[in-house]
A protein has these predicted regions:
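Conserved short loop/turn motifs at secondary-structure junctions
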Residues: 35-36, 63-67, 115, 143-144, ...
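FAD-binding core of FAD-dependent oxidoreductases
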Residues: 57-79, 86-109, 137-160, 168-169, ...
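Polyanion/phosphate-binding surface patch
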Residues: 54, 69, 253-254
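C-terminal auxiliary extensions adjacent to catalytic cores
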Residues: 2-27, 31-38, 42-50, 76, ...
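Glycine-rich, flexible loop motifs
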Residues: 2-53, 80-138
Length: 510
């Protein structure tokens, strides 16, 4: 599926970037021998419990509010199958393939801890889905934290439901048969293991980290272009001044801005034209930097969850000396809070970008042609793109409202506090897509302002960014259909290669 090297889970701490390599870029996923040994050990504990006829939640009892109902014999496998079927009740549009793949990756990471007790054939089945390009169709809505999304993945292992396969949506059984894969046989606890834990929110949050990290860098680049187009006063980014407020993110952003703007004749010619700039351009290090610090915090929280055992119950010890512990590790409060916090940062990045681009089209403050076009009146220019950005920024303010505090009660009072972590991760993904489009609009407007200010020399990095955009989007001379221009700019912001080219132009981009 990919030329990337295989990713191996199980021999050490996982990085969120490894999950992204598999889910988004198609790297093959494997488990280490040590991980398989842990999985087999936990399964042996389950088999011992069943053989001894012991009472253990989810192994020999019903689930949730039915935890006091004792089961035995064939009922144990029947419970696992029924768990998947009854929990596969999500609604709405299906997740994108990369989102479902991320969830499966996070589930495999959870099982690699060797504390769940599912049969190794299920883990092999999940790896086969990833490595053979078979992606279950998983409805996006219906999770208060976990359960429904992985149930839809689980039924695909049974040959039930639909999957994305070779560019089409087909029956799961047909895709498995086409790849020579058998359906799985379920035993005690297998169904519960598949639906339990925090893989849904964690996998989705890892993708969000990838998007947020890339867009935070682009925000610095595009913010620098707007700063230059508005002839900002570079003294605000002075290294000695910035060091007096030693937040790590702020230091990185200011260093980026100085590198991007180095050699700018535009800024040299504009030195001293005003005492100080508007806050939306003067405080880029402070605003972007604070957002980067929240991103760093969220990454630590999400990566810790990726390296956690989040099933219930968890199995400790060996088949000869074991403990079965009911606890609350599937509660995803840490990921939910991290995703909510990051959504606030994303809303701030988009909000300040909208303020900057509004200044670019406003002749009262920009010193540029009204709406960045000749013959205003006949041409509306970039006027309505600012409306679009304002709409997206407004939506992101709504998406910044925390999901984690919206608690409900489920399962007849047994589950009476819920994280809403999957909802938090999904709305974060929507906010990031809005941010990408806001930044794309700012990119278009700043580049158009450069057309006005040329042939003055621009900064080393900002000139490179201008050139990258102009490879796909021509200058705006008269009114034309703008939606494709926004889409083209947004596509650039989604690419790793364009950002790498830009970073190379200045030596590094933090």
């Amino acid at each position: 599926m990919s030329d990337l090297p295989s990713v191996v889970f199980g021999d050490g701490p996982l990085r969120w970037q490894e999950l992204v390599a598999v889910a988004r870029h198609g790297a093959r996923l494997e488990l280490s021998a040590a991980a398989w040994a842990r999985i087999d050990n936990a399964r042996a504990i389950v088999c011992r419990i069943v053989a001894n006829g012991e009472r253990a939640y989810g192994i020999s009892t019903g689930l949730g509010a039915l935890c006091d109902v004792l089961l035995e014999g064939e009922q144990l496998a029947e419970l696992s199958r029924n768990t998947l079927l009854s929990h596969a009740c999500g609604v709405g549009e299906p997740l994108r393939d990369e989102q479902t793949r991320a969830i499966i990756c996070a589930a495999v990471a959870n099982y690699s801890q060797g504390k769940s007790g599912l049969d190794r054939s299920l883990v092999e089945g999940l790896l086969a889905l990833l490595n053979h390009g078979i992606t279950p169709q998983v409805p996006a809505q219906g999770s208060v934290g976990y359960l429904t999304h992985m149930a839809h993945v689980g039924i695909a292992l049974l040959g039930i439901g639909e999957v994305s396969y070779r560019g089409s949506v087909v029956p799961a059984a047909a895709a498995l048969a086409a790849e020579g894969l058998a359906t799985v046989r379920l035993g005690a606890k297998d169904g519960l293991c598949l639906v339990n834990g925090t893989p849904c929110m964690t996998g989705l949050a890892c993708l969000a980290l990838d998007d947020a990290q890339r867009l935070a860098q682009w925000a610095d680049v595009i913010g620098a272009m707007s700063f230059e187009a508005l002839r900002g006063q570079l003294a605000a980014f002075d290294a000695e001044i910035v060091a007096l407020k030693p937040h790590p993110g702020m230091q990185r952003v200011a260093a980026n801005l100085r590198a991007l703007l180095a050699g700018s004749q535009v800024l040299e010619n504009a030195r001293g034209i005003r005492t100080q700039d508007a806050l939306s351009i003067r405080s880029i290090p402070q605003i972007h930097g604070a957002c980067r610090d929240q991103l760093a915090h969220a990454a630590r929280q999400i990566e810790t969850e990726l390296n956690s055992a989040t099933d219930n119950p968890l199995l400790l010890g060996t088949p000869e000396a074991y403990r079965v512990v009911s606890q609350a590790n599937p509660h995803g409060e840490s990921v939910a809070m991290a995703a909510d916090l990051l959504a606030i940062a994303v809303a701030e990045l988009g909000g300040v970008a909208e303020r900057r681009l509004d200044r670019l089209v406003n002749p009262l403050v920009s010193g540029l042609p009204a709406f960045l076009v000749g013959k205003p009146g006949v041409n509306s220019g970039m006027m309505i793109t600012q409306y679009v950005a304002a709409s997206l920024a407004g939506e992101n303010r709504q998406l910044a409202q925390p999901a984690v505090v919206d608690n409900f009660v489920t399962s007849a009072l047994q589950e009476d506090h819920l994280s809403l972590g999957t909802s938090a991760a999904l709305k974060l993904g929507r906010a990031l897509e809005n941010l990408r489009r806001i930044l794309a609009i700012e990119y278009l407007l700043a580049a158009q302002a450069f057309e006005v200010l040329a042939p003055q020399r621009f900064g080393q990095g900002t000139a490179a960014a201008w050139g990258i955009l102009r490879e796909r989007v021509p200058a705006y001379d008269t009114d034309r259909w703008l939606a494709p221009d926004i889409a083209s700019a947004a596509a650039i912001l989604g690419e790793r290669k364009s950002l790498a080219r830009l970073a190379a132009s200045i030596g590094d981009l933090q």
